[in-house]
A protein has these predicted regions:
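A surface-exposed partner-binding patch
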Residues: 1-102, 109-110, 186-234
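A near-ubiquitous, low-amplitude feature marking generic local secondary-structure context
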Residues: 2-6, 77, 88, 117-124, ...
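Generic low-polarity alpha-helical segments
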Residues: 12, 19-20, 24, 67, ...
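Short, surface-exposed, charged/polar-biased interaction segments
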Residues: 28, 36, 40-43, 115, ...
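Short, well-ordered strand-loop elements centered on a beta-strand within folded domains, enriched
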Residues: 102-122
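Compact, glycine/acidic-enriched structural inserts
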Residues: 115-153
Length: 234
């Protein structure tokens, strides 16, 4: 069994208190404790998901349709691209997308004594600073989860229930993360998630673009927010 201490030693890094608490409570484990490979008649959607969907780990539904938390072994054994300048830029990966873009703590930048969160593009030499700490990262992802929700993405995961099914799952995410977020963030998300959906030709939403931008600017802003830098070897 891989301990968080093992990962901290690997990267010479101390995870923030919130990350440690979520880890301890199983809230970062999308595998529900399973480490063994699946049998031929098993897969994650069939075997694991039904066990965790009603009390979901962090961002299970609200992280985005292509978002996935890394397993402990994936964090420990993460293979950095040979083009990444990891001597200059110290990343501690914790999540990824289907396109192999990576979410990571950025050891080079501390804001109010906590490490910033970055989004590293796999097919471009760009890394974006997206949050000043892990709590803000969760809050931002849960805000973005209710803006411009593509109907084609919904069809893929919610064939019969559509947006209504998606909203039920979002509310489950909010319920499970509620004890870990500050009261202000919980209140904001609760109010937005309680809305009726606005529908356009291609998408649904519970929040407008202006509201999303305004909320981010009001609650998440810091000097380096949304700035971009190159991470590859010159």
């Amino acid at each position: 069994m891989i301990l968080l201490d093992d990962i901290e030693k690997k990267y010479d890094f101390i995870f923030p208190a919130l990350f440690k608490q979520l880890w301890s409570d199983g809230m970062l484990d999308w595998m529900n404790g399973r480490t063994a490979p699946f049998n031929s008649d098993e897969n994650w959607a069939k075997t694991i998901y039904p066990e965790i969907k009603d009390n979901p780990p962090v961002l299970l539904h609200s992280g985005g349709f292509d978002f996935e938390m890394l397993r402990a072994k994936e964090m420990l054994d993460f293979q950095f691209d040979e083009l990444w300048n990891i001597e200059e830029h110290e990343f501690i990966p914790f999540a990824k997308t289907d396109e192999s873009n990576v979410y990571a703590f950025y050891k080079n930048l501390k804001v109010d004594k906590e490490y910033a969160i970055v989004y590293i593009w796999n097919d471009m030499n760009e890394t974006e600073i997206i949050a000043k700490n892990f709590e803000d990262f969760i809050f931002r992802k849960m805000l973005e989860a209710i803006f411009d929700i593509d109907k084609d993405d919904l069809k893929g995961d919610y064939k019969k229930s559509g947006f209504d099914g998606y909203k039920i799952d979002l509310l489950s995410d909010l319920k499970s993360i509620r004890p870990y977020l500050n009261e202000q963030y919980v209140d904001i998300l609760t109010n937005f998630y309680a809305r009726n959906a606005q529908e356009s030709m291609f998408s649904y939403g519970l929040i407008s673009k202006d509201e999303l931008v305004e909320t981010i600017q009001k609650h998440l802003v810091f000097k380096e927010l949304d700035s971009v830098f190159e991470h590859e070897i010159e």
